[in-house]
Amino acid sequence: MLAASASTQQLHNHIEYEIADIELAEFGRKELAIAEKEMPGLMALREKYHKEKPLKGARIAGSLHMTIQTAVLIETLVALGAQVRWASCNIFSTQDHAAAAIASSGIPVFAKKGETLDEYWAYTHRILEWGDQETPNMILDDGGDATGLVILGSKAEQDLSVLERPNNEEEIALYSSIRNKLSDDPSFYSRIKSSIQGVTEETTTGVARLYQMQANGSLPFPAINVNDSVTKSKFDNLYGCRESLVDGIKRATDVMVAGKIALVIGYGDVGKGSAQSLRGLGATVMIAEIDPICALQASMEGYRVVRLNDVVQNVDIFVTATGNFNVITHDHLIRMKDEAIVCNIGHFDNEIDVASLKPYQWENIKPQVDHITLPSGNKIILLAEGRLVNLGCATGHPSFVMSNSFTNQVLAQIELFTQGSNYDNQVYILPKHLDELVARLHLDKIGANLTELTEEQAAYINVPIKGPYKSEQYRY
């Protein structure tokens, strides 16, 4: 096996990594230098806490897209005292030069673009394997896979029947990886679970899993819902998608978006940003929604709200953004027009019924771009095999908006690691004053100057002069 392939390597101090090519480290380091200038929130936290090192003693198992922006996050956590092991949370989202830069700096990382499902779960296990009888004590998650692996594995220690009847290829790989681990170490997962002080979750889908566990009483440690910080969901989800969706579509297909008919399925924050993205390049955009409030919002913004089933034969570009499954079904797929582009910007790959297309003829155009011939003779263009198009076919959100999200992540990790005993096994949101702090840290970079309240004005509206300025119930 070549040294540059994804084989386990040893660096100084016996740091291990599995990446595509360590020779990409210099390229990654150059892009990291640019990203740091665009991520003022993270750099401000480094400056504030680098001497205090509030994360000293934290052993963080990180499962989040291994991009250049994530590399800045990782190095911020390390600068604040943490030990880190990292894997990507998506088989296509890794930027190999970013992984190489992190590996070359001595941080264990297990990620490469285009992982198999077996590799994906093997790498997720690697972030939990600390050696020398040590275990992680914190999880930083995106989509809930690392958290879910620990919890499902703990259940399987007691009852292997939970690993029966997988529903898809991903579950086949997941269940197999758990069985293999249990054969080597029958109490592995329960040891990990008992050592975790808290988890911070990045995205909508992972947060939904946490709330589900909280509701049924199975959440084994405190969690902070980073996604619903205003400076995450209203920025990363909205403005990030507004730029990265069309970036992915254009890099993958080179098509002219102007004049096309596009359908965005789901009009939450991600859907809103996606719709703006397509409209901004001149597409006629329609929205499909189940929620009457979101549907009304879309209508008031000038989008036509439709049912997928009624328009499927007329749409040029399909984008799913729901967090649900089987949104675009086989029946929808086989009715699509010739050269329709089909993609997803939700976290998981099950919004589009890609499995139902397997019997048909596939022609790979380039990585993450497939031409599929339907029974009608029409061909559709499937992007990133139905996984995140902006990370599979492009490089994800810009650094500046990710600085908002990742500053929240660092603050959440500090809070749970240093104050974990104050939290029950429930899901929490960072308080308003920290949300406002994250925003403040990013204003200078874009030349924004805040107006200041007078004492009389502050008293009149009954808020502190320095904030927070809105109630917890306020909807931005």
Curated annotation (Swiss-Prot):
Q: Which reaction does it catalyse?
A: S-adenosyl-L-homocysteine + H2O = L-homocysteine + adenosine
Purpose: May play a key role in the regulation of the intracellular concentration of adenosylhomocysteine.
Q: Which domain of life does the protein's organism represent?
A: Bacteria
Known EC number: 3.13.2.1
Keyword NAD assigned: yes
GO terms (BP aspect): L-homocysteine biosynthetic process; one-carbon metabolic process; S-adenosylmethionine cycle
Pathway recorded for this protein: Amino-acid biosynthesis; L-homocysteine biosynthesis; L-homocysteine from S-adenosyl-L-homocysteine: step 1/1
Signal peptide as annotated in the record: none
Q: How is the cofactor bound?
A: Binds 1 NAD(+) per subunit.
Cellular localisation: Cytoplasm
Instruction: Give the similarity note.
Output: Belongs to the adenosylhomocysteinase family.
Keywords of the record = Cytoplasm, Hydrolase, NAD, One-carbon metabolism
| Originating gene | ahcY
Species of provenance: Prochlorococcus marinus (strain MIT 9211)
Which cofactor(s) does the record list? NAD(+)
For this protein, what is any one GO molecular function term? adenosylhomocysteinase activity
**Gene Ontology cellular component?**
cytosol
Pfam families given in the database record: AdoHcyase (PF05221), AdoHcyase_NAD (PF00670)
Q: Return the InterPro entries for the record.
A: Adenosylhomocyst_ase-like_sf, Adenosylhomocysteinase-like, Ado_hCys_hydrolase_NAD-bd, NAD(P)-bd_dom_sf, S-Ado-L-homoCys_hydrolase_CS
Name the positions where substrate binds: 67, 142, 202, 232, 236
What is the name attached to this protein's record?
Adenosylhomocysteinase
Q: Record keywords: Hydrolase included? A: yes
Q: Which PROSITE patterns match?
A: ADOHCYASE_1, ADOHCYASE_2
